[in-house]
Amino acid sequence: MPAISCDPAAARAFAIVVVERLRAAGHEALWAGGCVRDELLGRTPADYDVATSARPDQVRAVFGQRRTLAVGAAFGVITVLGPRGAGQVEVATFRSDAAYTDGRHPAGVTFTDAREDALRRDFTINGLFLDPLTGTVHDYVDGRADL
């Protein structure tokens, strides 16, 4: 199976559009995880994740059923498919996790806010959020100090 090529500039532009569209629909939306780390270190992110106050059904309503995959909806995660060459963006609802029964998946999730979401993440660096429209970093866990 051939590799799917993704233009880094197109991927970044699409990740910004995802944030803009979620906000236009009345939801909080920020970049999260590795893309924030890479941006702060001056690197080109390999992919983009967005954390949002929108619930999975609301994310699907914003982007449409044909442009979304609900493979992680039980955990608040929807994949939004970009235009050709732009890749995809994982959009996760801010959440806190119940206990992990298998080491990988929580027994349940509770949708919450950005601060609570940052506290559940595995590394402080992954708890950083970035507003791509203003450049503002939201650091609830002192993750920037660990860069």
Regions picked out by a protein language model, each given a short descriptive name:
Residues M1-L147:
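Catalytic cores of the polymerase beta-like nucleotidyltransferase superfamily
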